[in-house]
Amino acid sequence: MQQIQLPQGMKDTILQECEKKKYLQNTLEQIFESFGYEEIITPTIEYYETYENAFKNIQTTDMYKFFDENGRILTLRTDMTVPIARVCASKFKDSKPPFRYRYTSNVFKVRQKFAGKRSEVTDCGIELIGLHSKSDVQVLCCALEVMKNFKNYTLEIGNVQFFQAACKVVRLSTEEINTLADLIDKKSMVDLKIYLDSLYLSEKIVDFFMHLPFLCGDVNILDKAYAYCFDESLKEVLDSMKECIQSLNELGCLENVTIDLGKVAHLDYYTGIIFEGYVSGVGTSILSGGRYDCLLKKFGRDLPACGFSVKLDPLIDHVDVQLKKKFILYYPESKQIEAMKQANTLRKEGSVILEPSLNETIYVKEVE
């Protein structure tokens, strides 16, 4: 039986699922192209050291690794941002930014048994490289244009600088920052209070971290957040976010946008705004992205960047697509040529299957 089973975390995409996925992919690619993004295709296999260079705390257990003929470690790509950073720093090292790239590629991550997650997914996304945070609104507008294709969507925006600035003022160690981030991300409030007390911080600083997981909601939450700022650097982050939100409002793009200042994931990667898109009925975020101003530097080009990716596979059942009509054209063998002529005409409306029949006449049946 093993030879007809799939490895853990893998899934076949078949028949109408393929049609829906291709429709969704084409829709997103048209949006990205309309925003001026050009396509890049990179190899499925990268050197492991490419990812090791990009991420300080790389999770090697999440990667499919193997060796080439010279003993160097290879890996199936786990995302597309790192390969694009590599391409930008090599193929476009003498070109002038900004760069606008788009992609549709399968990415791979080893999933734990019974986790219910797929090990191979299709990511469709963009990267805007070479422009600073003022351009975040451009990327957010593109993300919202994608989200409009789905019913009951939400785009949730945060900024890791709000948390990072607080930690910098308090002069926390990397270990302390990571522990705090984990507790805030999990909203483990009892454990968070115990840990904060162990750091002997002032009441105002403890109050900030204790309220951070709950500074989420509509855009007005930004005004409420000022009350917990214990340093000017925190207010500057909020000022920047309010400016971005105001720009979205002026562009008519503020519908279904919410704020979550407690987003503190991937601190070794993101450097500013972060955002996630959710669709009703899908149990996880289907769009994620943010600003990552330090990644390109690791590949030899010190350029700011912002981007996002969309996971296509969870959306297959949540896209409204008019599937092409399908017909079966039955014919007696003596009238095969005539049947083929009719089929050529009928294919303007959809796909046609020619099926021999014992009947004396040609007739057509539409497949439901």
Language-model-detected regions and their locations in the chain:
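TRNA-binding/sensing appendages of the translation machinery
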Residues: M1-V82, S90, K148
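Positively charged, Gly/Ser-enriched RNA/tRNA-binding surfaces
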Residues: E17-F35, E46-E49, T81-K93, Y101-F150, ...
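Structured core elements
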Residues: I41, T75, T154-E156, T258, ...
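Beta-rich nucleic-acid/ligand-interaction surfaces
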Residues: T42-T61, G158-K168, K263-G272
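Acidic, His- and aromatic-enriched active-site or binding-groove loops in soluble protein domains
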Residues: D62-D68, R171-I194, L201, V279
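Hydrophobic mid-domain F-helix/FG-region of cytochrome P450s
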Residues: L144-N149, F163-R171
